[in-house]
Amino acid sequence: MSEKKIEELLKLLSMNNGDMSKLTANQRKEMKEYKFWKTQPVTKFDEEVKEEGPIHEEKTPADIPDEPLPLLPDFEWCAIDVDDEKQLEDVFVLLNENYVEDRDASFRFNYTREFFNWALKSPGWTPDWHIGVRVKASKKLIAFISAIPVRLRVRAKVIDSVEINFLCVHKQLRSKRLTPVLIKEITRRVNKRNIWHALYTAGVVLPAPVSTCRYAHRPLNWDKLYEVQFTDLPPNATKAEMVAKYTLPKATKTAGLRELRLEDVDQALALFNRYQSRFDIVQEFTKEEFIHWFINDKNVVEQDKRVVFSYVVESEGKVTDFFSFYSLPFTILNNSRYKDLGIGYLYYYASDADFKFEDRFDKEGTSLLKQRLSTLVQDACIIAAQNKMDVFNALSSQDNTLFLEDLKFGPGDGFLNFYLFNYRTFPITGGLTEDQHFDTEHRSNVGVVML
């Protein structure tokens, strides 16, 4: 299928919040070219979901083969132990040289060792789920895929699952059909641990999205973004006007705002859990997981290597608000002045601003929450700018559409599709209207954030 056709389908899906029934027969037929996905337990494009739940009845680990899938003779499987510096270095090199680039090959993700340690070593992680493929002769790592355990709530049902991420095949070997083999092998290994469901995301359309969200970008350093061609100068605007438009206050506004500390975790987690209850798909965190994902790694001494930034608002000993964002910079490939672009990503947050209202969409409660989140996320942008980030990204997920436009987040070209493996569910709204604008009225029911 051509890239143009995929984009057209992506646009249609985002307009319909992932509802496959609104695709034409010809569009569905085109999507059937994804032969691999036709063999997998995923919702088909022309399938009418009548009941939520597993697609295949659960087997037992004893039903799953013990041996890994066969590879071409020149390749071999390996388990990557990210506690081993040399093995981590191999993943670092593979992803930084071969992972997602933009179409013009001007930018690509610059994954750091600190980021991998954070993203791949959550509680319950196992080297067996960090799978690599090496060349037998040279031992060069040429492919990678990872899974970490997560506990998902899909509406009222809680399911043990994994989160699949960092699927990467070396550019020169993408004709070898390694991707389907990697997916099948990670599935086999996860099934052997008695887990039968997975959450994953992709920018492309696969069978069949649970939801579709749109990216939004808030410039923090407009002048640099323009110079590296990350953004354009709008018609009838000057550079000085654009810099002035996106200039932020030098100091945060929220009284009682400070970094999240270990002693805050019980209060912050309780606040977070109550806030998350409004969404249809979320990850449920244990206390140990909450500490891992939101308490900054004290072993990272250098501030410029810090990955996650988490803050709470404390009022008279009570935690009333919480927000977090993480850093994942870009490498700039063709610029003599700048080598990297600092990128902040809005992560999870919670506020008690509307807790006294039973209806999430109560007019007064919505107004209070919008005001509170706008202040908190602007403070997040200020802190990100202070930490040398040049742009702040968010999705149309969670309650983000309440503040994106007011805080000068512009809609991006990219969309992110959410998928569930071996689990049927009705479409979940992704915060988009039919014309792909941010849906401030209905917002999103997606409460899970993937890296």
Swiss-Prot record:
Primary location group: cytoplasm
KW Acyltransferase (keyword) present: yes
Reaction catalyzed: N-terminal glycyl-[protein] + tetradecanoyl-CoA = N-tetradecanoylglycyl-[protein] + CoA + H(+)
Binding site for tetradecanoyl-CoA: 34-37, 167-169, 175-179
Annotated SUPFAM superfamilies: Acyl-CoA N-acyltransferases (Nat)
Signal peptide feature range: none
GO molecular function terms listed in the Swiss-Prot or TrEMBL record: glycylpeptide N-tetradecanoyltransferase activity
Subcellular localization(s) per the UniProt record: Cytoplasm
Name of the top EC class for this enzyme: transferase
This protein's record includes keyword Amino-acid biosynthesis: no
One matching Pfam family: NMT_C
Keywords: Acyltransferase, Cytoplasm, Transferase
Gene Ontology CC terms, in alphabetical order: cytosol
Active site location: 451 (proton acceptor)
Assembly with partners or alone: Monomer.
Family according to the record: Belongs to the NMT family.
UniProt function note: Adds a myristoyl group to the N-terminal glycine residue of certain cellular proteins.
Protein's recorded name: Glycylpeptide N-tetradecanoyltransferase
